[in-house]
Amino acid sequence: MRRTVSIQACAVVALALSLAAPLYAHHVKKGESTTLPVTTSSPKALDLYRKGMEDYENLYLERCNEDWRAAVKEDPNLAVGWAWIAFNSTNPEEITSARAKAKELATKLTAGEQLMVAWISKVQEGDFLGGITAMNDMLEMYPRDKHLLYLAGNWLMGENGNDQAKRLFEKALSIDKNYPAALNDLAYVDARNLQFAKAFAAMERYIALLPKEPNPQDSYGELLRMSGNFEGSLLHYRAALKLDPDFVTSQLGLGDTYALMGNQEQARVEYDKAIRFAHNEADRLTYSMQKAMTFVREGNYAEADKGYAEIAATAHAKKQNLQEAQSYRHLAEYQTDDSTAWKNLKLAEEALHHQSIISPSDRNEEMSRILRNRAARAAHSGNQALAEKELHELEALANGSRNRVIQSSYHGAFGTVLMDQKKFEAAIPQLEEDRDNPFTLELLVQAYYQTEQTEKLHEAEAKLRGINVPTMEQALVVPATRAQRPHI
């Protein structure tokens, strides 16, 4: 496991993410120490903060929050502790208050710590370029701090910046060739690039370095699943749970793997266990959405409707508005009736604005997905004026942000609308900017077919057929594609 975006947009994305890799313009004074210092008056708080970082690297994603909460209780002025609570918590109210506390204390910190706080806070507040610049300056100040290189690379992977992340992991491993956290994430980058032999070799090293930790087994299970080796995946997830029965992400992994294998009944059994032992409310809701998706995979849409509606209601009651919005969006994505889908997408948008505690970055990313779906639905129903309206709103969101997720939503939506207009040549460059999405890949295959680009068609179709990720897009596109004869 690892800690799981106009015409000018391509250039904007390239610019923003190119800034993520250290540029070494030498405009930032190097730190006096090799590693980033931590300002605190309490040795116990420092130990707890460092334990939190160790737990974070080993993917104990709720335990590290508990460590950091204990650290700031020992020293309420531990700004970087507050910053990482804001970064990693799943509680919107806690995220908002912790970020405010970190920013309030920032003036008392060293320059490097100030950059760390700025990176986290600016990104969450929607200033993507400002956050990347702060992160980049932090890395330039402490170029041999392997932990900072990992933290930055791990975040970049979540923003689809795989190439930039890979360079950071490789640099971290040049400092310490046996650094487990970087080795783990580098394997994920290789797997995303379909270089599974390299990824599996890294996993063997990762397990050897941390034989008593569950995450190496969990990661190996996920990468094997990505490659299509489901039985091998199940073995490693079970091995992780044997090492730590409370490593709930491996329990979730069993459910996800059975779902991809087509055994939805067993998937629900495994998901129920994950839901029961979830460490926080946000995770419990997310696992419940995965369970509801099994009914979509079975074609039991009435039961799926019921499941997602119940999750949305629970999320609303628990003030988990992001998960409420996600539930309504998923409910819309598999509907055959465009008006029903549109109704649920409207509810998804409303959920994002029930309270102001959702971070701007989370709100904007989810809104970009909602707008993408609305543009596609409008185009599908033949309402080109409405499709253009939704696309223009998404374009405005993309032009105001360097966020790669938002940029991808825009390109995917633009390409979808162009495909509906039979503008295949114009659609291709837009779709190619979002080619990891099964919805987009399906359209890209059609566009290559219509423009007689046979080699690219085969490449895109092979990639589409090989996608083994437990997402709604995969559920709606990939099994149906596999059931059809390949093009040409």
Where are these regions (language model features)?
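Canonical tetratricopeptide repeat
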Residues: 84, 151, 185, 219, ...
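Alpha-helical segment of the N-proximal tetratricopeptide repeat
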Residues: 41-70, 74, 114-133, 137, ...
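Residue-level recognition of tetratricopeptide repeat
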Residues: 44, 53, 77-78, 87, 120, 145, 154, 179, ...
